[in-house]
Amino acid sequence: MNMKLKAYFYYDIISPYVYLFLKSRKILEDKLELIPVPIFFPGLLRLQENTGPAEVPEKRIYTYQFCVWKAQKLNLPFQLPRRHPFASAPAQRILLQNNADLAMLDKAFDFVWGQGHDPELEWEDFCVAIGLSKNTPKPQDEKIKKALIESTQTAAHHGVFGVPSIRIDQQVFWGVDSIDWILEYLNKPEMFSEKEFQIAHSIINPLLEK
Protein backbone atom coordinates (compact mmCIF):
# COMPACT_ATOMS: atom_id res chain seq x y z
CA MET A 1 0.00 0.00 0.00
CA ASN A 2 1.46 3.34 -1.06
CA MET A 3 1.77 6.02 1.60
CA LYS A 4 -0.16 9.16 0.84
CA LEU A 5 1.71 12.39 0.28
CA LYS A 6 1.40 14.84 3.16
CA ALA A 7 -0.46 18.07 2.45
CA TYR A 8 -0.83 20.85 5.00
CA PHE A 9 -4.30 22.39 5.04
CA TYR A 10 -4.32 25.97 6.39
CA TYR A 11 -7.68 27.20 7.61
CA ASP A 12 -9.57 29.82 9.60
CA ILE A 13 -13.26 29.44 10.44
CA ILE A 14 -13.76 33.06 9.41
CA SER A 15 -13.70 31.99 5.76
CA PRO A 16 -16.70 30.51 3.91
CA TYR A 17 -14.29 29.36 1.21
CA VAL A 18 -12.80 26.89 3.70
CA TYR A 19 -16.26 25.41 4.23
CA LEU A 20 -16.65 24.91 0.49
CA PHE A 21 -13.18 23.36 0.31
CA LEU A 22 -13.93 20.93 3.14
CA LYS A 23 -17.07 19.80 1.35
CA SER A 24 -15.10 19.27 -1.87
CA ARG A 25 -12.03 17.56 -0.43
CA LYS A 26 -12.91 13.89 -0.96
CA ILE A 27 -11.17 13.68 -4.32
CA LEU A 28 -7.97 14.95 -2.66
CA GLU A 29 -8.18 12.58 0.31
CA ASP A 30 -7.87 9.67 -2.09
CA LYS A 31 -4.35 10.88 -2.89
CA LEU A 32 -3.24 13.09 0.01
CA GLU A 33 -2.99 12.98 3.78
CA LEU A 34 -4.56 16.33 4.64
CA ILE A 35 -3.06 17.74 7.83
CA PRO A 36 -5.16 20.59 9.30
CA VAL A 37 -3.22 23.68 10.38
CA PRO A 38 -5.18 26.41 12.18
CA ILE A 39 -4.01 29.97 11.55
CA PHE A 40 -5.40 33.42 12.33
CA PHE A 41 -6.34 34.92 8.99
CA PRO A 42 -6.49 38.59 10.15
CA GLY A 43 -3.01 38.13 11.60
CA LEU A 44 -1.78 36.69 8.32
CA LEU A 45 -3.15 39.73 6.48
CA ARG A 46 -1.33 42.06 8.87
CA LEU A 47 1.95 40.18 8.46
CA GLN A 48 1.76 40.64 4.70
CA GLU A 49 0.25 44.13 4.75
CA ASN A 50 -2.68 42.67 2.88
CA THR A 51 -6.38 43.55 2.85
CA GLY A 52 -9.13 41.04 3.49
CA PRO A 53 -12.31 40.83 1.40
CA ALA A 54 -14.40 42.10 4.30
CA GLU A 55 -12.51 45.41 4.17
CA VAL A 56 -13.56 46.15 0.59
CA PRO A 57 -17.36 46.66 0.53
CA GLU A 58 -17.91 45.52 -3.04
CA LYS A 59 -15.61 42.51 -2.62
CA ARG A 60 -17.36 41.58 0.63
CA ILE A 61 -20.77 41.37 -1.05
CA TYR A 62 -19.29 39.54 -4.04
CA THR A 63 -17.65 36.98 -1.74
CA TYR A 64 -20.90 36.19 0.05
CA GLN A 65 -22.89 35.94 -3.17
CA PHE A 66 -20.26 33.78 -4.86
CA CYS A 67 -20.33 31.37 -1.93
CA VAL A 68 -24.14 31.20 -2.07
CA TRP A 69 -23.91 30.39 -5.79
CA LYS A 70 -21.09 27.86 -5.36
CA ALA A 71 -22.90 26.08 -2.54
CA GLN A 72 -26.01 25.82 -4.71
CA LYS A 73 -23.92 24.36 -7.55
CA LEU A 74 -22.47 21.81 -5.14
CA ASN A 75 -25.90 21.14 -3.60
CA LEU A 76 -24.63 22.09 -0.15
CA PRO A 77 -26.46 23.69 2.76
CA PHE A 78 -25.17 27.23 3.15
CA GLN A 79 -26.29 30.06 5.38
CA LEU A 80 -24.49 33.30 6.13
CA PRO A 81 -24.15 34.37 9.77
CA ARG A 82 -26.02 37.56 10.66
CA ARG A 83 -22.71 39.36 11.27
CA HIS A 84 -19.34 38.89 9.63
CA PRO A 85 -16.44 39.05 10.08
CA PHE A 86 -16.76 37.76 13.62
CA ALA A 87 -13.73 37.38 15.90
CA SER A 88 -12.38 33.95 14.96
CA ALA A 89 -9.42 33.79 17.35
CA PRO A 90 -11.27 31.98 20.20
CA ALA A 91 -12.64 29.34 17.83
CA GLN A 92 -9.24 28.87 16.18
CA ARG A 93 -7.60 28.52 19.59
CA ILE A 94 -10.08 25.89 20.78
CA LEU A 95 -9.62 23.94 17.55
CA LEU A 96 -5.85 24.14 17.94
CA GLN A 97 -6.06 23.19 21.62
CA ASN A 98 -8.04 20.07 20.71
CA ASN A 99 -5.84 19.13 17.75
CA ALA A 100 -8.93 19.33 15.55
CA ASP A 101 -9.04 16.68 12.86
CA LEU A 102 -11.09 16.93 9.69
CA ALA A 103 -14.12 15.39 11.39
CA MET A 104 -14.12 18.11 14.05
CA LEU A 105 -13.58 20.76 11.39
CA ASP A 106 -16.61 19.46 9.52
CA LYS A 107 -18.70 19.99 12.65
CA ALA A 108 -17.25 23.45 13.27
CA PHE A 109 -17.72 24.71 9.73
CA ASP A 110 -21.18 23.14 9.42
CA PHE A 111 -22.21 25.08 12.53
CA VAL A 112 -21.04 28.39 11.11
CA TRP A 113 -21.46 28.16 7.34
CA GLY A 114 -23.92 25.32 6.95
CA GLN A 115 -26.29 26.65 9.62
CA GLY A 116 -25.38 30.34 9.82
CA HIS A 117 -24.30 30.53 13.46
CA ASP A 118 -21.83 32.96 15.00
CA PRO A 119 -19.11 31.15 17.00
CA GLU A 120 -18.17 34.34 18.81
CA LEU A 121 -21.66 35.16 20.12
CA GLU A 122 -22.88 31.54 20.33
CA TRP A 123 -19.82 30.10 22.01
CA GLU A 124 -21.60 27.49 24.15
CA ASP A 125 -23.52 26.11 21.17
CA PHE A 126 -20.35 26.12 19.08
CA CYS A 127 -18.54 24.04 21.70
CA VAL A 128 -21.40 21.54 21.84
CA ALA A 129 -21.44 21.34 18.03
CA ILE A 130 -17.79 20.28 17.93
CA GLY A 131 -18.23 17.73 20.72
CA LEU A 132 -17.12 19.72 23.76
CA SER A 133 -18.96 20.70 26.93
CA LYS A 134 -21.06 23.85 26.66
CA ASN A 135 -19.14 25.10 29.71
CA THR A 136 -15.84 25.01 27.84
CA PRO A 137 -14.22 28.44 28.32
CA LYS A 138 -12.61 30.44 25.57
CA PRO A 139 -8.91 29.53 25.69
CA GLN A 140 -6.83 31.99 27.69
CA ASP A 141 -3.70 29.87 27.97
CA GLU A 142 -0.79 31.96 26.72
CA LYS A 143 0.80 28.84 25.23
CA ILE A 144 -2.24 28.29 23.01
CA LYS A 145 -2.35 31.95 22.00
CA LYS A 146 1.35 31.86 21.18
CA ALA A 147 0.96 28.60 19.24
CA LEU A 148 -1.69 30.15 16.98
CA ILE A 149 0.51 33.19 16.37
CA GLU A 150 3.49 30.98 15.54
CA SER A 151 1.37 28.79 13.27
CA THR A 152 0.30 31.92 11.38
CA GLN A 153 3.88 33.18 11.12
CA THR A 154 5.07 29.79 9.86
CA ALA A 155 2.31 29.75 7.26
CA ALA A 156 3.41 33.17 6.03
CA HIS A 157 7.02 31.94 5.90
CA HIS A 158 5.90 29.10 3.61
CA GLY A 159 4.17 31.53 1.27
CA VAL A 160 0.58 31.12 2.46
CA PHE A 161 -1.40 34.32 1.86
CA GLY A 162 -5.01 33.20 2.19
CA VAL A 163 -7.38 30.46 3.30
CA PRO A 164 -7.99 27.76 2.40
CA SER A 165 -4.45 26.92 1.33
CA ILE A 166 -2.85 23.56 0.69
CA ARG A 167 0.93 23.15 0.89
CA ILE A 168 2.54 20.12 -0.72
CA ASP A 169 6.28 20.18 -0.06
CA GLN A 170 6.98 23.88 -0.74
CA GLN A 171 4.22 24.43 -3.29
CA VAL A 172 1.18 26.38 -2.08
CA PHE A 173 -2.26 26.18 -3.65
CA TRP A 174 -4.91 28.68 -2.62
CA GLY A 175 -8.67 28.56 -2.79
CA VAL A 176 -11.46 26.08 -3.34
CA ASP A 177 -11.00 26.41 -7.10
CA SER A 178 -7.42 25.09 -6.91
CA ILE A 179 -8.47 21.47 -6.41
CA ASP A 180 -8.18 20.58 -10.11
CA TRP A 181 -4.77 22.25 -10.22
CA ILE A 182 -3.61 20.20 -7.23
CA LEU A 183 -4.71 17.00 -8.92
CA GLU A 184 -2.82 17.91 -12.09
CA TYR A 185 0.27 18.78 -10.03
CA LEU A 186 0.17 15.36 -8.35
CA ASN A 187 0.23 13.74 -11.78
CA LYS A 188 2.90 16.14 -13.02
CA PRO A 189 5.09 17.24 -10.08
CA GLU A 190 7.64 18.87 -12.40
CA MET A 191 4.96 21.34 -13.55
CA PHE A 192 6.40 24.39 -11.80
CA SER A 193 9.86 23.77 -13.25
CA GLU A 194 8.55 24.29 -16.76
CA LYS A 195 9.50 27.49 -18.56
CA GLU A 196 5.93 28.77 -18.79
CA PHE A 197 5.55 28.61 -15.02
CA GLN A 198 9.06 29.87 -14.22
CA ILE A 199 8.44 33.06 -16.20
CA ALA A 200 6.13 34.23 -13.41
CA HIS A 201 9.19 34.75 -11.19
CA SER A 202 10.88 37.09 -13.66
CA ILE A 203 8.01 39.49 -14.38
CA ILE A 204 9.04 43.02 -13.40
CA ASN A 205 6.74 44.71 -10.89
CA PRO A 206 6.89 48.50 -11.49
CA LEU A 207 5.16 49.08 -8.14
CA LEU A 208 8.25 47.79 -6.34
CA GLU A 209 10.78 49.69 -8.42
CA LYS A 210 12.40 52.76 -6.90
Residue ranges of predicted features:
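Short, Lys/Arg-enriched N-terminal segments with co-localized hydrophobic residues
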Residues: 1-2
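C-terminal cap of thioredoxin/glutaredoxin-like
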Residues: 5-8, 14, 18-32, 107-210
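Structural alpha/beta surface segment adjacent to cysteine/selenocysteine redox centers
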Residues: 13, 17-112, 196-210
